[in-house]
């Protein structure tokens, strides 16, 4: 009996070992390395994204545009000369998320570099829910003036998705499909009421905590102000190849009063690399 009991135990251990070996391994997806956005036959931007050996963003290079290097020192990421008029943008990290951002510009009166905009981000867990902003501008005779916005950005979540972004009296609502957002696809609800352009798919978006769980289906912009009758609608279409989103189309319609709708169709192509 002892012999059979021993053999039975060996069989159980073997089965448990096989169970551990059979656990599915989630493959690491390649990183977004190229984005091309066009409208009709016109290329709006063509961007290469380069990475360091430890998978950090090394630079974002726009063909016929800025080449933007990233510098890493301790918990700070610095984006150099991201656009005309901005000397650099500094991001402070806590763990894997951005907790504040400082936009630095040159003072035209004394050439001093100053913080023109400071954003402090608020999270619930790893989900971004809001940001405050301190805006500063130089005075011709010296010194600075500033203004604080406690609720510069507000994000509302439902079922793992950002369904509403608000700023003052402006609103943009999002609806989602049942398709899941791949972990390497950096689309994000950005603080904009015209969500087109490179910023919606910048890899920096992956540093703002949880992305929306699902891919967007549509978005609608409107204002609660009686002085602003502009509305806009956006429809999203995605093409997937295996685990990767290889293209995205955004159909934009902008309405203002009784004028005919302004229509645009933006086509994005995505390339990935290890």
Show which residues each predicted segment covers.
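Buried hydrophobic residues that stabilize the cores of well-folded domains
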Residues: 20-274
